[in-house]
Each structure stands twice: as C-alpha cells, then as structure tokens.
C-alpha cells in the first residue's frame, strides 16, 4: 500500500492531492490548494513550505510526486515557479519522502490519454478515475493527476519487474529441464 502526495506547484496557488494505492485500486484521501496572498516572494515560499509540511503531517504519505518545470515565455514567472517547486521538494525531503518528478505532458497523457489535454479534461478524468461525486478545483485536480501518474508508474514498474522475474524463472526451468533431459532423467512424450 502506498499513500502518494501529488503537488502542482505555483507561487500563488499550489495544488495538492493525496491518494492511497492498494494494488491497482486508487482511493481518494484529500485535495485542495495552498493559497498565498499578495505578499513578497519569500513570505509566499514560507507559506508553501508550511502548507506542504502540514499536509505531510496530516496524511502521512510515503511518496511525493511533483510536476517538472516547463519552459515558460516569461523568465520571471519560470524562476518563481521553480522556487515554489523547490520549496515543496525541500518540505518533502525534510520529511524523508522520496521525490518523483513528472512532465505535465506525461501526466495529461496518463490521465486523459492526450498529452495536450486541457484543465477541464483533466478534472473530468480525475473525477472518473477516483470516483468522486464532485469535480475538484483545477489546481487540486492537477495535483491528483500527478499522484495518479505516479501510481500508474509504480504499477507499470511492478508489471515489468514481474515479467522479468517470470522470464528469468522460465529460462531457469528450461535450462533445468534441458539438463535433466540430456542426462536421461526425463523422456519427452510427444
């Protein structure tokens, strides 16, 4: 079982979403946004750090997933986003959480099936995947989508690991049978 905290970073609004993964089953635990007032940037970063730390304390996740920085047209906006993202990552690392990063395009591809999906499509699919009665707000939906992407990544990794183990086991069994057959211990019946 994994509890995954997804973060959609922003210098003014940082979305968060928490899900529990048990096998292939995903369960919604909570979501929302850390909103900062029109303050200077250091104070906003302090609020983001405190907010993420509070969420970690409340939900006790064992994994932390965050959206990667994308190229922005405005350099100042990109720098502020990077600082907000770094602040959230520091909160996770200070709470001994492993950090996983996902590109926005991959998140949309995983959740909606289209890497260029818009926020409304992401909200709709998050609502369906987690069987929510109401659509989460956009920033929270994005954060939940990031958590869902990480859950799918875990499931995919387990599938690959199991396939590799099966292949290794099959190869060992084949080698064993060939050895025993060549020594006359088994006779093939056709």
Swiss-Prot record:
<feature type="active site">
    <location>
        <position position="8"/>
    </location>
</feature>
<keyword id="KW-0238">DNA-binding</keyword>
<dbReference type="GO" id="GO:0006281">
    <property type="term" value="P:DNA repair"/>
</dbReference>
<dbReference type="GO" id="GO:0008821">
    <property type="term" value="F:crossover junction DNA endonuclease activity"/>
</dbReference>
<keyword id="KW-0963">Cytoplasm</keyword>
<keyword id="KW-0233">DNA recombination</keyword>
<dbReference type="InterPro" id="IPR012337">
    <property type="entry name" value="RNaseH-like_sf"/>
</dbReference>
<dbReference type="InterPro" id="IPR036397">
    <property type="entry name" value="RNaseH_sf"/>
</dbReference>
<feature type="binding site">
    <location>
        <position position="67"/>
    </location>
    <ligand>
        <name>Mg(2+) 2</name>
    </ligand>
</feature>
<feature type="binding site">
    <location>
        <position position="139"/>
    </location>
    <ligand>
        <name>Mg(2+) 1</name>
    </ligand>
</feature>
<keyword id="KW-0234">DNA repair</keyword>
<dbReference type="Pfam" id="PF02075">
    <property type="entry name" value="RuvC"/>
</dbReference>
<keyword id="KW-0255">Endonuclease</keyword>
<feature type="binding site">
    <location>
        <position position="8"/>
    </location>
    <ligand>
        <name>Mg(2+) 1</name>
    </ligand>
</feature>
<dbReference type="GO" id="GO:0006310">
    <property type="term" value="P:DNA recombination"/>
</dbReference>
<keyword id="KW-0540">Nuclease</keyword>
<comment type="subunit">
    <text>Homodimer which binds Holliday junction (HJ) DNA. The HJ becomes 2-fold symmetrical on binding to RuvC with unstacked arms; it has a different conformation from HJ DNA in complex with RuvA. In the full resolvosome a probable DNA-RuvA(4)-RuvB(12)-RuvC(2) complex forms which resolves the HJ.</text>
</comment>
<feature type="active site">
    <location>
        <position position="67"/>
    </location>
</feature>
<comment type="similarity">
    <text>Belongs to the RuvC family.</text>
</comment>
<keyword id="KW-0378">Hydrolase</keyword>
<dbReference type="GO" id="GO:0048476">
    <property type="term" value="C:Holliday junction resolvase complex"/>
</dbReference>
<dbReference type="GO" id="GO:0000287">
    <property type="term" value="F:magnesium ion binding"/>
</dbReference>
<keyword id="KW-0227">DNA damage</keyword>
<protein>
    <recommendedName>
        <fullName>Crossover junction endodeoxyribonuclease RuvC</fullName>
        <ecNumber>3.1.21.10</ecNumber>
    </recommendedName>
</protein>
<comment type="function">
    <text>The RuvA-RuvB-RuvC complex processes Holliday junction (HJ) DNA during genetic recombination and DNA repair. Endonuclease that resolves HJ intermediates. Cleaves cruciform DNA by making single-stranded nicks across the HJ at symmetrical positions within the homologous arms, yielding a 5'-phosphate and a 3'-hydroxyl group; requires a central core of homology in the junction. The consensus cleavage sequence is 5'-(A/T)TT(C/G)-3'. Cleavage occurs on the 3'-side of the TT dinucleotide at the point of strand exchange.</text>
</comment>
<dbReference type="InterPro" id="IPR002176">
    <property type="entry name" value="X-over_junc_endoDNase_RuvC"/>
</dbReference>
<keyword id="KW-0479">Metal-binding</keyword>
<feature type="active site">
    <location>
        <position position="139"/>
    </location>
</feature>
<dbReference type="GO" id="GO:0005737">
    <property type="term" value="C:cytoplasm"/>
</dbReference>
<keyword id="KW-0460">Magnesium</keyword>
<dbReference type="GO" id="GO:0003677">
    <property type="term" value="F:DNA binding"/>
</dbReference>
<dbReference type="InterPro" id="IPR020563">
    <property type="entry name" value="X-over_junc_endoDNase_Mg_BS"/>
</dbReference>
